[in-house]
Amino acid sequence: MNIQRAKELSVSAEQANVSFQGMPVMIQHVDESNETARIYEVKNPGRELTVPVNSLEEI
């Protein structure tokens, strides 16, 4: 996924179909300078991760 699309999805009111390593996730924040995204698992919102934006996949 590219940074611009990740930013669009992070501010969208609708739940996006995004996955990280096969897990459905939500994007909380995108850090353009580091090209990373703060995400959490849909099924486990308490598990937050910072991952490279290019490791996210829109499904």
Swiss-Prot record:
Induction context: Expressed only in the forespore compartment of sporulating cells.
InterPro entries linked to this entry: SASP_SspH
Pfam families assigned: SspH
Transmembrane annotation, as ranges: none
Localization terms from the record: Spore core
Listed GO CC annotations: endospore-forming forespore
Family assignment from sequence similarity: Belongs to the SspH family.
Protein name: Small, acid-soluble spore protein H 2
Key words, A-Z: Sporulation
GO biological process: asexual sporulation; sporulation resulting in formation of a cellular spore
Organism, scientific name: Bacillus anthracis
